A protein has these predicted regions:
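Short S/T/G/P-rich N-terminal loop/turn motif that feeds into the first structured element of a domain
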Residues: 1-48, 52-203
Length: 203
């Protein structure tokens, strides 16, 4: 799998959403190998999108379409500065509680790990126990970048359920796992709370 993370500052979330809705309507049918996208804008105007493709080749074919270029030329004008693109083939998808497209709340976390391999190993442990402890989590997509950087997308049933889940006392084994994960972070991660997530999949 190949993922492209697009982010930047916007001043009109509704206009950006209309542009992406337009892409789904007009361009998605011709985007062979596109698997789905999660996007949204935080309350302070930070836009982020995570687009998934079957392969890097499929993503490049999409980017090279004239209609894609024309669409992005117009959409880029909605950003208050330059949008950044970060590509990755280091992708782990974990779906435990249904269809991520049904999520009522999405949180994107970006940071840097001192040991990405160990962090990925920890994320894959005790998935059944985590699913039982946090039924509000539908699934996640973990994306590794150069230099230990990462983007993690977590899909929740609702923000209310997510906040309630955060307050629950963890079983000791899961707490130890979380403590080790946090200790691997270099600096403080950035959180993007998408209270109205845009969830797109091929029709």
């Amino acid at each position: 799998m190949f993922v492209q993370v697009i982010q930047g500052q916007v001043s009109d979330a509704a206009a950006v959403r209309a542009a992406f809705d337009g892409w789904i309507q007009d361009l998605a049918p011709g985007a062979d190998g596109w698997l789905g996208s999660t996007a949204g804008v935080t309350e302070d105007g930070r836009f982020i999108a995570v687009a998934r493709f079957e392969s890097e080749e499929a993503a490049r074919r999409n980017s090279n379409r004239p209609e894609q270029d024309a669409w992005w030329s117009e959409t880029a004008k909605l950003f208050t500065g330059e949008a950044t693109f970060t590509d990755s083939t280091d992708v782990a998808v974990d779906v435990t509680g249904g269809d991520p497209d049904d999520a009522g709340f999405v949180q994107v976390i970006q940071g840097r790990s001192s040991d990405p391999a160990r962090a990925q190993e920890l994320m894959g442990q005790d998935s059944t126990a985590w699913a039982e402890f946090r039924p509000d989590i539908i699934g996640s997509v973990g994306v590794g970048h150069a230099g230990g950087a990462y983007t993690t997308v977590v899909y929740f049933t609702s923000e209310e359920a997510a906040r309630e889940g955060e307050r629950k006392e963890m079983p000791p084994a899961l707490q130890a796992q979380m403590d080790e994960m946090n200790a691997l972070n270099v600096g403080t991660p950035d959180f993007f709370d998408l209270r109205e997530p845009w969830l797109y999949s091929p029709r």
